[in-house]
């Protein structure tokens, strides 16, 4: 039984201009036509197995001085710290920020709602402040909390 595209010929094996096998069937012409799209000839540049770099050199912020005259690649943590405000501080400086609320006494006494809650087993305390605005934390604030030395 013959299928579509087969017209009683026998299969022959040929190679194209790049040495790849090209199988044709029957006596159909193998040029343009018959649904075949010819690719434009491309010139392959041979480098004899040697990788060559371009003469262009550009400065990149993905590496920094390692202190010994060489360069080293920055980690993802260092790149994130660079983008955050205050992230360009030296690694030796550990600044801790304290969030305090000062209340001033009015005619009826202090108006702030600062409370300290004992955590029990660990003996520490956790400060909670009830803000009138109830402002939610943004993504950047959440990331800042997770970075060491930012509290």
Swiss-Prot record:
Residues 39-51 have a biased composition (Basic and acidic residues). Induction: By abscisic acid (ABA) and water stress. Residues 90-105, 117-132 have a biased composition (Low complexity). The keyword Zinc does not apply. Residues 1-138 are annotated as: Disordered. Disulfide bonds: none annotated. Keywords: Stress response. One of its GO terms (biological process) is response to abscisic acid. Pfam families: Dehydrin (PF00257). InterPro entries: Dehydrin, Dehydrin_CS. One of its GO terms (cellular component) is cytosol. PANTHER family: DEHYDRIN RAB16D, DEHYDRIN XERO 2-RELATED. Belongs to the plant dehydrin family. This is Dehydrin Rab16D. The lineage of its organism: Eukaryota, Viridiplantae, Streptophyta, Embryophyta, Tracheophyta. The gene is RAB16D.
């Amino acid at each position: 039984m013959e299928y579509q595209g087969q017209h009683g010929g026998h299969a022959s094996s040929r190679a194209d201009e790049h040495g790849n096998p090209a199988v044709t069937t029957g006596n159909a012409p193998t040029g343009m036509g018959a649904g075949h799209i010819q690719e434009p000839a491309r010139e392959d540049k041979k480098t004899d197995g040697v990788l060559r770099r371009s003469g262009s050199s550009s400065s990149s912020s993905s590496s920094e001085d390692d202190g010994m005259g060489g360069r080293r690649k920055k980690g993802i943590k260092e790149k994130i710290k660079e983008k955050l405000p205050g992230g360009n501080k030296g690694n030796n400086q550990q600044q801790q920020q304290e969030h305090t609320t000062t209340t001033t006494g009015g005619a009826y006494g202090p108006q702030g709602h600062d409370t300290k809650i004992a955590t029990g087993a660990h003996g520490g305390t956790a400060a909670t402040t009830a803000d009138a605005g109830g402002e939610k934390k943004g993504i950047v604030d959440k990331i800042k909390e997770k970075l060491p030395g930012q509290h």
